[in-house]
Amino acid sequence: MAESLEEAKQEVRQLRAQLDQWAKAYYEQDAPVVEDHVYDEKYARLLELEAAYPELKSADSITQRVGGEVNSDLPKVEHPVPMLSMGDVFSKEELAEFDQRVQKAIGHPVAYNVELKIDGLSLSLEYEEGCLKRASTRGNGQVGEDVTKNVKYIKDVPQKLPKAITTEVRGECYMSKEAFAKLNQERDEAGESIFANPRNAAAGSLRQLDPKVTKKRQLSTFIYTWINPPAGIDSQHQAICEMAKLGFHTNENGRRLENLADVYDYIDEFTKKRDSLPYVIDGIVLKVDDLALQADLGNTVKVPRWEIAYKFPPEEEETVVREIEWTVGRTGVVTPTAVMDPVRLAGSTVARASLHNPDLLAKLDVRLGDTVKLHKAGDIIPEISEVVLSKRPEDSVPYEVPTKCPSCGEDLVHLDEEVALRCINPSCPAQVEEGITHFASRQAMNIAGLGPKIVKQLIAKDLVHNVADLYYLTADDLSQLDHFKEKSINNLLVAIDQSRKNSVELVLFGLGIDNVGGKAAQLIARKFKNMSKIASASVQELTAIDTIGMTIAESLTAYFQQEEAKKLLARLEEAGVNMDYLGEDGEAADNFFKGKTVVLTGKLAHYSRAEFTKKLQALGAKVTGSVSKKTNCLVYGEDAGSKLAKAEALDIPRLTEAEAISKIEEKDTEK
């Protein structure tokens, strides 16, 4: 405890500022910066100080508020009945104290309905005459966000009830462990930041402005509260059973328990079972079962007096660091990973944990041979929390961060005050390998059959040095690969050829430009329509696009200023790779050739017949070999013969090769 009022005042001020910052990151940005147990410890300390020094209590203290402020672009919703937070405890002794307070207020022992504490986002569902009218988040408890359009894509939320009742239910929106792993894998492959845990993935997915994003994210719900339930429903346990009959997804693990001893057994049971559940839980919730007694006990300004959450302590194990590996990513970032003695943690065997960057490595002061404490962030991602200094070997020496790239041996650098360590050699084998693999990935150019192992062989046999080289591969080249027979060769060549027709946003994303993820590439392509305009766009023009910030804009402009990038784009275009935006549904954006039947004739000076055909097809044209009344346009080069004469006779519009190229580059909307 602080020794004086002045010391307490200073500590309270610091705690409130820190907790406000952490709460903003957690509730409003869906991006936690500390583990839950760290936040809980600081919060408990603030409560302790405010209790010891009542004069320091303040209405604007985080201990007197619910959740976070509502500052998103989603419509705002005022809750008719406030969505309160929940008090929490961290030991069975504190749970016993809660039980004693309840018994003292009621005058006798009570039964509890005990439920699993799902790690998700609070959700309200309002129904009118049995139809879903509105769905909203908790927000600050008084005002939340309208997420009705998004909730319609959550499969287990009934859009219509079997009874035409007007009511409100509340529960938790969450993401299963399987859906979370799949989402993070897709985001990682797409070059986007991964979510720290399923709770934040669920929150970020539910609070999307675009419901189509929510639809892809596989969210689920557990409903556990009925606001003003119908007459005849007298208990929490009964309310859950009746909500299940109406079609709501309720958790089957809830139980009505008569005494605290049974509650302790329940805690012990699910402490052991939590890792095997398909969703993340971070504790159990104890609720007075009798609804009338709940009403008698009432609420504080922030939490109900009739319920409490018991939070599981963070599960930690000790293990020994044997090695620190450094891997090079496609953008040149070099990442350290601790290789440890395998240890069983939270339901799986863990032997590796990312150390993210040299700054974190230095902050933790991890050394070879160190015993470290390991936990899983959000019960999913292994992390080292601290070094057990009492077990550090006597001959231990500080770990020296490498100065040379582990792949190419070039110097490693820090760019513009980044914490990341980078290799800036564009010919670095690891970067080339990662870059080509990314370009061929399902989220980018989707070249089936071109995985990491094949890419590694292509590089090892000196067949490719960059992504453009893929489009110049021949059957003879591919025959040099191990276990690659005629069928595999043909399939890969077909897949590479098909990728030429992709829309330009896939090419842009496939280039692996730092900070440019799949969504950003799509927004940029939609705005500028073709690669030429994208490459010449200024930072100001790029940041004028909604959600495109300075980081992305500066990365993009810096990339296109490089001579190597200009050469690469030229070779891709020469290979017939489409450089135009084909629209939302893969259809060509409006242009002169869209929807027209075109015939090519004569000797073409700028492109081969095949290359010109691919360009026209990418713009939505149909290219045929003969002139007829159905032909809409003839493009001719030197020494054009009978096809030009026939087109003139049928009065079919005719363009020289130069005129056609001009039309392609203009992308005008002339019909």
UniProtKB/Swiss-Prot annotation:
Q: Which residues bind Zn(2+)?
A: C405, C408, C423, C428
Q: Which key words tag this protein in UniProt?
A: DNA damage, DNA repair, DNA replication, Ligase, Magnesium, Manganese, Metal-binding, NAD, Zinc
Q: Where does NAD(+) bind?
A: D36, H37, V38, Y39, D40, S85, M86, E115, R138, E172, K287, K311
Q: Where is the BRCT domain?
A: 588-671
* General function of this protein: DNA ligase that catalyzes the formation of phosphodiester linkages between 5'-phosphoryl and 3'-hydroxyl groups in double-stranded DNA using NAD as a coenzyme and as the energy source for the reaction. It is essential for DNA replication and repair of damaged DNA.
Q: Ligase among the record's keywords?
A: yes
The answer, when asked if DNA repair is one of the entry's keywords, is: yes
In Gene Ontology terms, what is one molecular function of this protein? DNA binding
Q: Which cofactor does it need?
A: Mg(2+); Mn(2+)
The record's comment on protein family reads: Belongs to the NAD-dependent DNA ligase family. LigA subfamily.
The record ties this protein, via InterPro entries, to: BRCT_dom, BRCT_dom_sf, DisA/LigA_HHH, DNA_ligase, DNA_ligase_AS, DNA_ligase_CS, DNAligase_adenylation, DNAligase_N
The alphabetized list of GO BP terms reads: DNA repair; DNA replication
Which reaction is this enzyme known to catalyze? NAD(+) + (deoxyribonucleotide)n-3'-hydroxyl + 5'-phospho-(deoxyribonucleotide)m = (deoxyribonucleotide)n+m + AMP + beta-nicotinamide D-nucleotide
The EC number(s) attached to this protein equal 6.5.1.2
Q: Which Pfam families match?
A: BRCT, DNA_ligase_aden, DNA_ligase_OB, DNA_ligase_ZBD, HHH_2
Protein name, entry field: DNA ligase
Active site positions: K117
